[in-house]
Amino acid sequence: MIGKTFTTMLGGRELSIETGKLAKLVSGSVTVRYGDTLLLVTAQASDTQSKLDFLPLTVEFEERHYAVGKIPGSFQRREGRPGEKAILSARITDRQIRPLFPKGYRHETQVIITVLSADGQNAPDVLGPIGAAAALSISDIPWAGPTACVRVGQIDGQYVVNPTTEQLTRSRMDLVVAGTREAVMMVECGAQTVSEDDLVGAIEFAHAEMQGVIALIEQMRAEVGHEKFNFLAEEGPANDYVPELTEKAKAAGLRDALLTHGKKDRSARLKALRNGLIEGYVPDPTAEGSAELTQALKDAFGKVEKRELRRLILEENLRADGRDSKTVRPIWIEARPLPTAHGSAVFTRGETQVLGVTTLGTERDEILIDDLTAESGDKFLLHYNFPPYSTGEVKRMGGQSRREIGHGNLAKRAIRAVLPSFEEFPYVIRVVGDVLESNGSSSMGTVCAGTLSLMDAGVPLKAPVAGVAMGLVMEGDNYRVLTDILGLEDALGDMDFKVCGTAEGVTALQMDIKVGGITPQIMREALAQAKEGRLHILGKMAEVLAAPRAELSPTAPHILSLKINPELIGKVIGPGGKQVRELEAMGAQVTIEEDGTVRIFSASGESAEAVKARIEAVTKEAKVGEEFEGTVVKIAPFGAFVNLFPGQDGMLHISQLSEQRVENVEDVLTVGDKLKVKIANIDDRGKIDLIRPELEGKVPLREPRAPRGGDRGPRRDSDRGGDRGPRREFSDRGPRPEGARSERPEGQRTERPATAPATQESSQSSDAPAAPVFPRRED
């Protein structure tokens, strides 16, 4: 038998991991199956140690469109660069496995997750981390796993592990948790304003549920795992200089340099201090071996700097900018700095500054999605930009980095929870967060700036959202949670814990751990401290914009909505789209849905209103009893045609013109006359008979026409078959009594005179004047 399969139950469904069947030449290879979702996950490390000073780990998440029976929509009809969802899925796996590689490990390592089958209900993004943990565990790559990953939803107050796609639509949260047997490693969450207690409960629930998966991977490692290869952790000579440099740096004023206010000034003082110490060891930079020694001393000074900063935080509750552990940096906000944008705001917190800009568009502006999900488009876009000048650096600028995509997605999830529905606010919304300065928490600055720009644009948010980044410094059992961390604290600390939400609860959360994991107690403390910081920031935001503006920006587009009878959609479109083109020529775009919802988009409010009025007129449905101020548009021998509203005429019969007998319609009405009319009857074909309201009850109404088709009852002449008797003779072709026929040879039709009126009548009153032919009602 080829391959070996290991199974366990997870969320009431079987999870199976198979190895030894596919991709057998790689160091570690498994297939993960959950329902009908199937993934191939491989792990491979290079044989040689790289010279890089960081862990060269890459995680790729490959979506194959054949997994859902689709052909890619690209020009070449093949998969191209990974989409946003694939990148976010890869980041989930990366953040779970990265902290567990041994210190000093520098072998280039690659984990590739390929989606082979997707059933549309069991999401592959949380199965990829399980496959990565299994592949690394059974491979010869040094790694301190295993880990596991699960998704948790909350439906009707109950936690649900790995909810299906359908269940997620009813869930109050979408929480992804990864961890080891002992602790939580990674958390990512989007929620509909849930409490901190609900979040902690869900995280603990997830950690308990993943234990069966961890046990399964441990069993795999015991039965089919390979021995880990030995690697040489190149410590270098830097560690030899740390003790001596520590004493010299403290004596030279390291503490004061670390506590210097301002990122640039602090960096300059620390650099000057470092260079001064190095000169004592390397008097001649051009001498042989000086470059290697200088680099070793720089590395050693970095370790000294990190240790002293952590000591100040733990022992003295002092941070690099002089704050204590719970204080938020000073905040400055400006609303509507951009005069022509639909909504804009600048949010500055310490030395982190973000320009948030909101743009409103139509359904035609929604982004199209071509991935393995059933989603076809997204009407809310949030783009996070991190240019090199924000940190005072020079770098090559290209496409969006994975970091930018991840930070933007977090801000997007935070704000999406408070957006109105598309039915309530029928705009496609794009928010851009341009980071202008960065010294920590730029993604949280984007949440605040984006929220303010939405409020400035007049988007009716359910509540304002703010975000704050929390940090952690931990030495053994001693730890301290930090509010609103600096970039330096992010780099030298042990946790980056971002929390976003309203005054009522959390809407998004992301946690990355650099140590072996944190306990629920630390997480509770971090969430409680984050709430204090979030409420403080919301208060500062309310001082500038307490609520969304009552009106849209003058530069914002105008969108009007109305509902029409779906059967009348064709009238709005017109033959060959003629009517829609005429509407768009009035300065507006029109979209029509199958349920009859019509949306009008225009840069001008007047144009939008004019198009709406035109559509309402075209689709207006007349009702019996309604009165109108109509206009005579046509005169016929039997009556007058009166326009009630655009596209709809009615017929006012000659018998309804006056209490006295009228011989000639033109004696009473002419084309262009205005008069009040009332709808007396609408037949099965939609033809309208009118009366004059002032004559109602004074003039007998016409009898309604017999419906077309079906049984029409006996004819006036009874049956047409049999002997009808002789025809009446007429001496000329002049007028004849109603119902009379002229004599003609059998089988020969009587030709209509060239002067016969073009007007057609559907029925004829007994008191109508005689006519040379029997006219039919004109449509």
Swiss-Prot record:
<keyword id="KW-0694">RNA-binding</keyword>
<dbReference type="InterPro" id="IPR012162">
    <property type="entry name" value="PNPase"/>
</dbReference>
<dbReference type="InterPro" id="IPR004087">
    <property type="entry name" value="KH_dom"/>
</dbReference>
<dbReference type="Pfam" id="PF01138">
    <property type="entry name" value="RNase_PH"/>
</dbReference>
<keyword id="KW-0460">Magnesium</keyword>
<dbReference type="InterPro" id="IPR001247">
    <property type="entry name" value="ExoRNase_PH_dom1"/>
</dbReference>
<feature type="binding site">
    <location>
        <position position="496"/>
    </location>
    <ligand>
        <name>Mg(2+)</name>
    </ligand>
</feature>
<dbReference type="InterPro" id="IPR036612">
    <property type="entry name" value="KH_dom_type_1_sf"/>
</dbReference>
<dbReference type="InterPro" id="IPR003029">
    <property type="entry name" value="S1_domain"/>
</dbReference>
<dbReference type="InterPro" id="IPR015847">
    <property type="entry name" value="ExoRNase_PH_dom2"/>
</dbReference>
<dbReference type="Pfam" id="PF03726">
    <property type="entry name" value="PNPase"/>
</dbReference>
<dbReference type="GO" id="GO:0000287">
    <property type="term" value="F:magnesium ion binding"/>
</dbReference>
<feature type="compositionally biased region" description="Polar residues">
    <location>
        <begin position="757"/>
        <end position="767"/>
    </location>
</feature>
<dbReference type="InterPro" id="IPR036345">
    <property type="entry name" value="ExoRNase_PH_dom2_sf"/>
</dbReference>
<keyword id="KW-0479">Metal-binding</keyword>
<dbReference type="GO" id="GO:0004654">
    <property type="term" value="F:polyribonucleotide nucleotidyltransferase activity"/>
</dbReference>
<comment type="function">
    <text>Involved in mRNA degradation. Catalyzes the phosphorolysis of single-stranded polyribonucleotides processively in the 3'- to 5'-direction.</text>
</comment>
<feature type="binding site">
    <location>
        <position position="490"/>
    </location>
    <ligand>
        <name>Mg(2+)</name>
    </ligand>
</feature>
<dbReference type="Pfam" id="PF00013">
    <property type="entry name" value="KH_1"/>
</dbReference>
<dbReference type="Pfam" id="PF00575">
    <property type="entry name" value="S1"/>
</dbReference>
<dbReference type="GO" id="GO:0006396">
    <property type="term" value="P:RNA processing"/>
</dbReference>
<dbReference type="GO" id="GO:0006401">
    <property type="term" value="P:RNA catabolic process"/>
</dbReference>
<feature type="region of interest" description="Disordered">
    <location>
        <begin position="699"/>
        <end position="779"/>
    </location>
</feature>
<feature type="compositionally biased region" description="Basic and acidic residues">
    <location>
        <begin position="699"/>
        <end position="752"/>
    </location>
</feature>
<dbReference type="GO" id="GO:0006402">
    <property type="term" value="P:mRNA catabolic process"/>
</dbReference>
<dbReference type="InterPro" id="IPR020568">
    <property type="entry name" value="Ribosomal_Su5_D2-typ_SF"/>
</dbReference>
<dbReference type="GO" id="GO:0000175">
    <property type="term" value="F:3'-5'-RNA exonuclease activity"/>
</dbReference>
<keyword id="KW-0548">Nucleotidyltransferase</keyword>
<keyword id="KW-0963">Cytoplasm</keyword>
<dbReference type="Pfam" id="PF03725">
    <property type="entry name" value="RNase_PH_C"/>
</dbReference>
<protein>
    <recommendedName>
        <fullName>Polyribonucleotide nucleotidyltransferase</fullName>
        <ecNumber>2.7.7.8</ecNumber>
    </recommendedName>
</protein>
<dbReference type="InterPro" id="IPR027408">
    <property type="entry name" value="PNPase/RNase_PH_dom_sf"/>
</dbReference>
<dbReference type="GO" id="GO:0005829">
    <property type="term" value="C:cytosol"/>
</dbReference>
<dbReference type="InterPro" id="IPR015848">
    <property type="entry name" value="PNPase_PH_RNA-bd_bac/org-type"/>
</dbReference>
<keyword id="KW-0808">Transferase</keyword>
<feature type="domain" description="KH">
    <location>
        <begin position="557"/>
        <end position="618"/>
    </location>
</feature>
<dbReference type="InterPro" id="IPR012340">
    <property type="entry name" value="NA-bd_OB-fold"/>
</dbReference>
<dbReference type="InterPro" id="IPR004088">
    <property type="entry name" value="KH_dom_type_1"/>
</dbReference>
<comment type="similarity">
    <text>Belongs to the polyribonucleotide nucleotidyltransferase family.</text>
</comment>
<dbReference type="GO" id="GO:0003723">
    <property type="term" value="F:RNA binding"/>
</dbReference>
<feature type="domain" description="S1 motif">
    <location>
        <begin position="625"/>
        <end position="693"/>
    </location>
</feature>
